């Protein structure tokens, strides 16, 4: 105590003298320059903290932040340049978790924090300062304070509770990170390894159980320091567990509607068990977060023409038709939801940022526009492509992420072929799978006056894909709900489709006084249009085909192995056998650890309304489903709304 000196600085309206008095009462030596500096502030994003942080990093001096004002005081973290992250690491997370403030900053072109007046009592300030002084005392006596080096502690004076919020060092931090700036780095190939599966029960084949995934990554859930602000369970029927996740997300359409969606929740998780649904929600949130453009991604400048063969034209992946481009202004003015919009035609001469993507097929880097690869990348020209989540997945290993991402591509591609060509497909005999869960679902749906059935919509890739369909049977508005699933294991694919139907079902369950459906106010307008207007009589492709026998369990061979790498290799073989190329963008973020991959197979179709020539027209003829390809005008005019 005698040899260690503590300095107190203040940035904001808090007086240093109050904390100095508490420190001195503990016999702590206070000086203008100390072995540890405590900084008092009323906002952890005070711009002056940046300069203080840089000085502390330069001098390798530990320091600690305290906000004693407001009903919830913040104590810590304690920044130690030799051991922990810095203020910049923390500030990045704090900004991400203030979506309304960030939106106002971007709209008004201001950067200073919007600190509201903080209500407090002298007694609550004294309590917070006393807690902070005690932590300083511990640091001096023990030579360290691991609790504060790893956490921001929030003290709620009203609830009389403290909460620890884990914060992590960001290896990519521009102030203290050891990773070099992304623009100067060379890309690394995606190297795959053998990975033994240990979990194959629910939702997919995994390297480890959902409980283990949660244990490893749930520290990323925090409204203050986390990448996921909130993970909440949605009340349900008990047959499927559903979670919704709120997290930072940047859309290129930076408007009030996008902000509302961010605040309401961008990601969801589903599963037959609570832990599976919770892990699913957390992983999808981290997947989305990891795909947001941060500025340190590896990029290469050039035009499509000058990049040569290594560049992939984005419309080979997006698949908009010339007619869609031609009519885009009228369509965009009328369409609902950003995922139905059509971008500007791609300018092949414009110099833009390109992102390297590893081709598993050719074992070399190819390039796609960065705007296509990352959410929220905002160029200074009219948008000619943008990112979506198709083929994106998180996993405990990169192999697991690639497998899940590829199955999503297969699912969406099969949905597009079935939906836009309005093809009747065989029903699946759920009883043949001898799965109690399937029976329980069917029985539950009967009790709420709904029918439930499953169609086999497997494509030419011969990976099982299913569409689960449910409609009301007691009135003219049928509120038809759909869910999809793809997997090497047909039973898991069916389960995915059924749990997705169950995930969407709450949107159509509640009634108004007149008996009509009471749709949630923030529901997508296109989805509500579908629920109000679609009927089986108008949409015969939703009805099982009576020309072929129902599919039974014995019709599906076992395709999966016990090794995730072998499964990925099989996916690659299937792609290449059909004359396509399989590419992977590793979107894993160094400060998170959960592996995230975006799998891209140019030519495979999204389920949204993208009507360029190719598989959409060719596969139904190749497979004998149609005698000749439909014209664009003959395709199903109602966009897939999910």
Where is each model-derived feature located?
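N-terminal charged helix/coil linker that caps or initiates catalytic domains
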Residues: 1-7
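A glycine-biased structural micro-motif
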Residues: 3, 147-153
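E1/E1-like adenylate-forming module used to activate ubiquitin-like modifiers
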Residues: 7, 11-13, 19-26, 34-128, ...
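Hydrophobic beta-strand scaffold residues
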Residues: 30, 60-65, 452, 582
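Conserved beta-strand termini and adjacent loop/short-helix elements that scaffold enzyme active sites
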Residues: 31-33, 66, 89, 455-457, ...
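Short glycine/serine- and small hydrophobic-enriched flexible loop segments
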Residues: 131-139, 283
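Helix-biased "structured C-terminal domain" signature
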Residues: 161-642
């Amino acid at each position: 105590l005698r040899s260690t000196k503590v300095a107190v600085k203040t940035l904001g309206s808090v007086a240093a003298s109050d904390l100095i008095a508490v420190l001195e009462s503990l016999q702590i030596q206070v000086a203008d320059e100390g072995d540890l500096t405590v900084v008092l502030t009323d906002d952890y994003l005070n711009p002056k903290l940046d300069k203080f942080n840089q000085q502390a990093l330069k001098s390798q001096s530990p320091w600690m932040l305290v906000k004693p004002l407001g009903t919830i005081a913040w104590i810590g973290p304690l920044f130690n340049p030799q051991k922990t992250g810095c203020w910049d690491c923390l500030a990045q997370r704090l900004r991400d978790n203030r979506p309304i403030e960030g939106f106002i900053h971007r709209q008004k072109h201001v950067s200073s924090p919007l600190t509201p007046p903080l209500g407090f009592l002298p007694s609550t300030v004294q309590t917070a300062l006393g807690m902070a002084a005690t932590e300083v005392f511990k640091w001096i006596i023990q030579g360290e304070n691991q609790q504060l080096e790893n956490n921001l502690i929030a003290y709620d004076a009203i609830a009389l509770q403290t909460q620890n919020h884990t914060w992590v060092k960001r290896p990519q931090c521009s102030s203290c990170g050891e990773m070099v700036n992304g623009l100067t780095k060379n890309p690394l190939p995606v190297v795959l390894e053998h990975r033994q599966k240990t979990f194959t029960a629910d939702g997919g084949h995994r390297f480890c159980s959902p409980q283990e995934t949660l244990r490893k990554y749930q520290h990323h859930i925090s409204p203050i320091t986390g990448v996921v602000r909130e993970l909440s369970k949605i009340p349900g029927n008990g047959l499927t567990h559903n979670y919704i996740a709120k997290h930072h997300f940047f859309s290129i359409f930076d408007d009030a509607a996008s902000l509302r969606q961010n605040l309401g929740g961008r990601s969801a998780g589903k599963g037959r068990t609570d832990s599976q649904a919770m892990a699913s929600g957390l992983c999808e949130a981290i997947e989305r977060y990891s795909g947001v453009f941060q500025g340190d991604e590896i990029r290469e400048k050039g035009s499509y023409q000058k990049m040569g063969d290594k560049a992939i034209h984005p419309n080979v992946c997006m698949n908009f038709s010339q007619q869609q481009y031609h009519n885009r202004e009228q369509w965009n003015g009328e369409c609902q939801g950003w995922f139905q919009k059509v971008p500007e035609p791609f300018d092949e001469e414009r110099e833009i940022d390109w992102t390297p993507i590893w081709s598993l097929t050719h074992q070399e880097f190819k390039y796609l526009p960065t705007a296509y690869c990352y959410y929220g990348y905002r160029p200074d020209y009219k948008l000619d492509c943008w990112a979506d989540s198709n083929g994106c997945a998180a996993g405990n290993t990169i192999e697991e992420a690639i497998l899940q991402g590829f199955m999503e591509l297969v699912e969406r591609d099969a949905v597009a072929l079935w939906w836009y060509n309005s093809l009747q497909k065989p029903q699946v005999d759920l009883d043949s799978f001898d799965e109690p869960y399937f029976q329980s679902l069917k029985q539950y749906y009967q009790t709420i006056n709904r029918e439930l059935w499953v169609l086999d919509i497997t494509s030419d890739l011969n990976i099982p894909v299913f569409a689960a369909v449910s409609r009301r049977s007691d009135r003219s508005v049928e509120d038809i709900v759909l869910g999809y699933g793809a997997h090497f294991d047909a039973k898991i694919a069916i389960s995915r489709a059924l749990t997705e139907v169950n995930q969407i079902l709450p949107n159509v369950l509640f009634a108004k006084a007149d008996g009509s459906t009471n749709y949630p106010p923030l529901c997508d307008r296109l989805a509500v249009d579908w629920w109000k207007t679609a009927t089986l009589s108008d949409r015969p492709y939703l009805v099982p085909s009576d020309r072929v026998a129902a599919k039974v369990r014995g019709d599906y061979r076992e395709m999966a192995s016990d090794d995730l790498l072998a499964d990925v290799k099989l996916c690659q073989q299937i792609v290449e056998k059909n004359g396509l190329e399989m590419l992977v963008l590793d979107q894993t973020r160094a400060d998170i650890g959960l592996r995230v991959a975006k799998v891209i197979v140019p030519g495979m179709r999204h389920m949204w309304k993208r009507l360029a020539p190719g598989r959409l027209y060719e596969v139904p003829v190749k497979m004998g489903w149609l005698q000749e390809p439909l014209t664009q005008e003959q395709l199903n005019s109602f966009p897939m709304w999910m």
